[in-house]
């Protein structure tokens, strides 16, 4: 039986290219049968494969003396085996309250942070965990019942990037029963976590009431679920590539904390790519630390939000992420503090940097720019009173418009241009020393501006609006 177990794991490791020879492996060991079976399997292969083994154990301090005894058990075991052992006690309940998350998510974050630290300390290539085939079945069932993303429905990955190496699960090809039999043959007496039997947890109920029926239908059901998982992961990788490619054409603006997209262009994508496109945006903005409260329901909400007939509105997501729609554009970004009114003099020539990182640059020239687009303002030097002043908008602001009699409200210009309300407060209003509004960058020039057609040889004051926005590409 022992040889059969080892051979099955060998085949699985080889088939999925799980780990390479001459590697340092950090093994997560709780003291339970799964992690002990993994440790003993790797120790059996250590000499032939030239593995360096480091054991890592986390006491989450959920079970008082009992969990502390687990830690001591792992330390004593490693001492007897002559294996390096790194342990830590973490008050996960305190961490949970501090960051407002559920116990399982808090424990996972603390545990993975410790594993990453140990991986770095020993320059390890792999972190190995003891998830097995039954875990895979339970995970996929649980996500189907609760709802998840397409990536989530694929279940547990055999191998995925982690820190500067990989997180691997060599036992996904074997069942819990095979693991227990392997431990019995080696006369290993593992620690048992009583919480694994509590029926308050969905996973435990699936394990007790659903999994046995599936195994009655097919004793090798875990292999079918593993095959399903691999196919889902392969399909998902392809669709992710397509979504990434498409989204880089949909995105109109991108900064570290904000992404804007064109709704009509986004809606031209197929629904599978739309869902994945939203997920890519969330991954980028949350820096892959997606809040546990975020689910596929939120992605569906965004897609429904785009289909509404109202031209504007907003959604609030976990972690202070706000999604704001303004006509045919939608912006995803983190809530910012209220923009304070601003006033700043701009020398000629000179440069100022605006709060959003964009710049206004002035120059004096006898020639006008060849490209007189919305980012350029040109006036006769002597028609303007100096200094130039850059300020935030004020109630009642009006300006004379180039080629039009009378004046127009700045508010009306913003509305016509479909500028979102939150952007209006930080939009620069360019005035002269007499208080005349001479330019609303990117939107309207005043009657002080000259056109390319009417320009003659003269001395001109020129203002350029230079955006710091990077290209609309998102990170994978």
UniProtKB/Swiss-Prot annotation:
Q: Which SUPFAM superfamilies match?
A: Adenine nucleotide alpha hydrolases-like, MesJ substrate recognition domain-like, PheT/TilS domain
Q: Name one Pfam family in it.
A: TilS
Which terms does the record give in the GO molecular function aspect? ATP binding; tRNA(Ile)-lysidine synthase activity
What's one GO-annotated cellular component?
cytoplasm
**EC number, UniProt record:** 6.3.4.19
In the record, biological process GO terms are: tRNA modification
Q: Which UniProt keywords apply?
A: ATP-binding, Cytoplasm, Ligase, Nucleotide-binding, tRNA processing
Q: Kindly state which reaction or reactions the protein catalyses.
A: cytidine(34) in tRNA(Ile2) + L-lysine + ATP = lysidine(34) in tRNA(Ile2) + AMP + diphosphate + H(+)
Q: Carries keyword Nucleus?
A: no
Job description of the protein: Ligates lysine onto the cytidine present at position 34 of the AUA codon-specific tRNA(Ile) that contains the anticodon CAU, in an ATP-dependent manner. Cytidine is converted to lysidine, thus changing the amino acid specificity of the tRNA from methionine to isoleucine.
- What name does this protein carry? tRNA(Ile)-lysidine synthase
- In the UniProt record, what gene is named as encoding this protein? tilS
């Amino acid at each position: 039986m022992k040889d059969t177990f080892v051979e099955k794991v060998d085949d699985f490791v080889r088939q999925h290219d799980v780990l390479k020879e001459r590697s340092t492996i950090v093994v997560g060991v709780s003291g339970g049968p799964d992690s002990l079976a993994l440790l003993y399997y790797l120790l059996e292969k250590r000499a032939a494969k030239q593995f360096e083994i480091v054991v890592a154990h986390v006491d989450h301090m959920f079970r008082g003396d009992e969990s502390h005894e687990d830690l001591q058990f792992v330390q004593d075991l490693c001492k007897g085996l002559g294996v390096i052992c790194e342990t830590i006690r973490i008050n996960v309940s305190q961490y949970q309250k501090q960051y407002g998350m559920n116990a399982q998510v808090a424990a996972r974050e603390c545990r993975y942070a410790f594993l990453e630290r140990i991986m770095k300390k020993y320059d390890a290539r792999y972190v190995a965990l003891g998830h097995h085939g039954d875990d895979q079945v339970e995970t996929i069932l649980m996500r189907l019942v609760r709802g998840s993303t397409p990536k989530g429905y694929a279940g547990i990955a055999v191998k995925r990037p982690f820190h500067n190496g990989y997180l691997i699960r060599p036992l996904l090809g074997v069942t819990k029963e095979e693991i227990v039999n392997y431990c019995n043959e080696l006369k290993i007496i593992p620690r048992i976590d009583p919480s694994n039997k509590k029926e308050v947890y969905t996973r435990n109920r699936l394990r007790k009431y659903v999994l046995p029926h599936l195994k009655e239908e097919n004793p090798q059901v875990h292999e079918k679920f593993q095959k399903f998982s691999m196919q889902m992961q392969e399909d998902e990788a392809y669709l992710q590539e397509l979504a990434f490619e498409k989204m880089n054409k949909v995105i109109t603006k991108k900064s570290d904390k904000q992404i804007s997209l064109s709704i009509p262009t986004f809606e031209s994508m197929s629904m599978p790519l739309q869902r994945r496109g939203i997920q890519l945006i969330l991954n980028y903005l949350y820096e892959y630390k997606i809040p546990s409260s975020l689910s596929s329901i939120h992605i569906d909400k965004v897609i429904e939000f785009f289909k509404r007939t109202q031209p504007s509105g907003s959604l609030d997501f976990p972690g202070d992420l706000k999604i704001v729609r303004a006509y045919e554009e939608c912006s995803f970004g983190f809530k910012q503090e209220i923009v304070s009114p601003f006033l700043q003099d701009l020398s000629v020539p000179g440069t100022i940097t605006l709060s959003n990182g964009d710049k206004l640059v002035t120059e004096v020239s006898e020639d006008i720019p060849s490209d007189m687009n919305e980012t350029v303002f040109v006036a006769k030097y002597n028609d303007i009173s100096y200094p130039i002043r850059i300020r935030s908008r004020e109630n009642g602001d009006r300006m004379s418009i180039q080629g039009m009699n009378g004046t127009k409200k700045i508010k009306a210009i913003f509305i016509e241009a479909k500028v979102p309300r939150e952007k209006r407060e930080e939009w620069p209003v360019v005035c002269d020393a007499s208080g005349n509004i001479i330019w609303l960058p990117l939107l309207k020039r005043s009657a002080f501006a000259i056109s390319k057609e009417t320009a003659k040889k003269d001395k001109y004051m020129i203002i350029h609006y230079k955006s710091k926005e990077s290209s609309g590409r998102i990170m994978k």
